[in-house]
Amino acid sequence: MLKYMLDTNIVIYVIKRRPLEILSRFNQNAGKMCVSSITVAELYYGAEKSEYPERNIAVIEDFLSRLTILDYQPKHAAHFGNIKAELSKQGKLIGENDIHIAAHARSEGLILVSNNLREFERVIALRTENWV
């Protein structure tokens, strides 16, 4: 049963195996983690603009083959609209992709694992953890 949605920065930490303590948390939660298709898009973007795109794409694809990837659906978009409107009213907007990822995790009842809690803590009813 899925419990956690990994943010892009957490995926990168696990792939790079730094910091080391993240690997034990990752391994302890095998089978309980997923990523959003939004995170997948961010990973491909990072690989494409890197010095070694082909190598980095292969690493990403190998890593993702071991995780569940959740597709972004209309119900997630509805949460996106709600979150963005609330943050806008407060004058506390966060990055567009971060809102999509937060909406995806919140609407699925998942805990978002990120090293960017300063922004994600602004999102009402989003459960978060930092494994770093």
Curated annotation (Swiss-Prot):
Pfam families the UniProt entry points to: PIN
Disulfide bonds: none
Keywords: Hydrolase, Magnesium, Metal-binding, Nuclease, Toxin-antitoxin system
E.C. number: 3.1.-.-
Domain PINc: 4-123
Keyword flag Ribosomal protein: no
Record text on subunit structure and interactions: Probably forms a complex with cognate antitoxin VapB2.
Family named by the database record: Belongs to the PINc/VapC protein family.
Full protein name: Ribonuclease VapC
